[in-house]
Amino acid sequence: MSDSVFIYAFTRYGWVEECIDIDEVAYVDFEKSQICLKAHDAQIPRMIQTTSVDLYNVEKALLRNRR
C-alpha cells in the first residue's frame, strides 16, 4: 500500500492543496523548493513548486517507505 501526502503547490492560480502519491515522487530538490514526479507516458517530468515544510514532509514519507 502506498502513502499519500497533502502538499501546497504553487500554481498560476495561487496556492492549491494537492494530494500526491509517494510512489510517484522521483526526487525532492531543496535548493529550488520543488518536488519532481516520475514521468511515465510524458516526456517531461512534472515539477511542483512548494513550501519547505512540504518538502520535508515528502522526504520523511520517502524515507519511511524505504524501510
Model-derived regions: residue spans:
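Acidic, Ser/Thr- and proline-rich intrinsically disordered linker/docking segments
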Residues: 2-18, 24-67
